[in-house]
Amino acid sequence: MKLIAVSGGPDSMLLLDVFKHHDIVVAHVNYNKRNSSKRDQKIVEDYCFKNNIKLEILNLTDYEVKGNFHDWARKKRFDFFKLVYEKYNCDEILLAHHKDDFVETFLIQKNQKRKPLYWSIKSKNFNFGMNINRPFIHKYWKNQILKILDNKQIFFGQDETNKENIYLRNKIRNNLLNKEFLKRLIYIKILFLNFFKLRKIKKIEQDFNKWKEQNFDKQNFLKSKFQENLITIFISEKTNNSINLSRGKIQQIIKFINSEKNEKKFILNKEFYLVKAKKIIKVLKK
């Protein structure tokens, strides 16, 4: 069985329509943050009822968020997806990212001066204890999705806040509006960048697997030429990809691991910290 994350927006509604005849269950999260939230939920409910599709809904109300709302919302969303995934014994979760998302994510990474192992978003990966599949990531641009929905007369909701430049992704997205040729050039550039990283990625994965087999011991880590990459993968795996590491932070972590001083822990964020326990590197929850 496949789990499909459906917000009620155009991308996920097309994804749902494409897979409606498969063995699926739908998960919808309503944050009740926008006036149109109930409308989006009803769109998903109506479609699933009409097509006899299993639907699980998480309704979040009366909450206070300290810090970044998007980080908080992402954690709530994926915690819920994991529960549904396990309840129905799913083999993968489908997400509706498309080519525009691929380009936007790359530009966000560049803006934040990040140097990831893989630029932008992978079509398939394993995270949060789930097999994640993004069928549209190299298939459709946003304008193509909208045309298909129009032709098939599929209802969807538009998030009115997407037009507001209150978040970095919104600013990048709105700046790329009607710049189709530029988007295509950037898309091709990302594919080339990732292609030339493949050999290095394979070697890094070998080093990481070897380090993992040794229970993440300090000595094996220090032998690797790819310490920055190993730290990125290690932290991502241990925190369910909930921490965005800057290069400066990665260097601080490496310095902490290398240090012979009696430093007990390295704070990663409000939820996680790193420790050196008997020459073994561990990530623990507070």
UniProtKB/Swiss-Prot annotation:
**What is a GO molecular function of this protein?**
ATP binding
Top-level class of the enzyme under EC nomenclature? ligase
**Reactions catalysed according to its record:** cytidine(34) in tRNA(Ile2) + L-lysine + ATP = lysidine(34) in tRNA(Ile2) + AMP + diphosphate + H(+)
InterPro entries cross-referenced by the UniProt entry: Rossmann-like_a/b/a_fold, TilS/TtcA_N, tRNA_Ile_lys_synt, tRNA_Ile_lys_synt_N
Query: What's the Enzyme Commission number for this chain?
Result: 6.3.4.19
GO cellular component, alphabetical, reads:
cytoplasm
Q: Which UniProt keywords apply?
A: ATP-binding, Cytoplasm, Ligase, Nucleotide-binding, tRNA processing
- UniProt: ATP binding residues: 7-12
| Major location (coarse) | cytoplasm
One GO term under biological process is:
tRNA modification
Q: Which CDD domains match?
A: TilS_N
Q: Does this entry carry the keyword tRNA processing? A: yes
Cellular localisation? Cytoplasm
Give the matching Pfam families: ATP_bind_3
Q: Which family does it belong to?
A: Belongs to the tRNA(Ile)-lysidine synthase family.
* Function description: Ligates lysine onto the cytidine present at position 34 of the AUA codon-specific tRNA(Ile) that contains the anticodon CAU, in an ATP-dependent manner. Cytidine is converted to lysidine, thus changing the amino acid specificity of the tRNA from methionine to isoleucine.
Comment text on domains: The N-terminal region contains the highly conserved SGGXDS motif, predicted to be a P-loop motif involved in ATP binding.
Instruction: Please state what the protein is called.
Output: tRNA(Ile)-lysidine synthase
